[in-house]
């Protein structure tokens, strides 16, 4: 195991003092360490984080540090290849990558796929990397950073689950809103009509939905759980809704909403009356450490209408919750419902595992 302080000190020794990225459960101790620091920006997507880092280098000539989960490496490929690559603008960057699905760690199916090819992706990009497992690995990483500085190239380190020591700056997640998320979801799935379809986003949303279905035997509608593809739930829901007469309910989170905001605009402008979008807004990246998304600063009523949605609803407490939920369900879409909720309170949430069965059940008419 390694301490976050040791990693940060190595970076600072190499004159790297700027950090940006997308929160990851493997790297949550790093996020906790960087919390509230002026030289740290939580980006909405990995590509955005890389681009922010590029801008920092162009202004300061100092190499930035960009962190992400390896599942988000695909989002980062465009600016990494078309801007920062040695054969393009040759901009030095330091990548810290949380390595889900590494060969030494048992993980979920979607992470196993990406974990297996992560090193090959870095090799294809000619990015030198170090697997950080203990303090002895810092010597190699330090050499690679110095090489990156000298030759204006990109360098990376891979960090596996459980590698980072819990640091003294770690803090428990705090709720920004008071409405219990489980209470709303239970109410929603009780009211959703038979033959309706639900597509829910990655993270806790899908796992909570699956848990509540089973616990209370609420299985009259079918769900598709987005175990990956953060930010793409609304697009999958849109594609389904355009070819179906069934009502489609898209359950999303604020972090995912912001990651690919343009997709919501597409849904608002092209969806039919059977499309219902539900934003569970807890103002945090709940499943990866509770870091703030700053979604509390957004007026979702004005935003949703400017993105093409015909109707907006809002729920922030139990008062009129059932009435508003019923009205939202009955309303012709595309309709948008923002629900201000707490972080997840359910312990030991199950994970979708038999994914082919889930897909086949969902596709039944």
Where are the language model's segments positioned?
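A short, conserved beta-to-alpha structural element at the edge of catalytic cores
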Residues: 150, 272-293
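Short acidic, glycine/serine/threonine-rich loops at helix termini
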Residues: 31-32, 77-79, 105-109, 166-172, ...
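Active-site diphosphate/adenylate-binding microenvironment
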Residues: 3-15, 169-230
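Glycine-rich beta-alpha junction loops
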Residues: 24-26, 100-101, 159-165, 202-206, ...
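Thiamine diphosphate
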Residues: 29-98, 207-282
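Glycine/aspartate-rich loop-and-adjacent alpha/beta segment that forms the canonical ThDP
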Residues: 75-79, 83, 154-194, 330-365
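Conserved thiamine diphosphate
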Residues: 105-147, 291-327
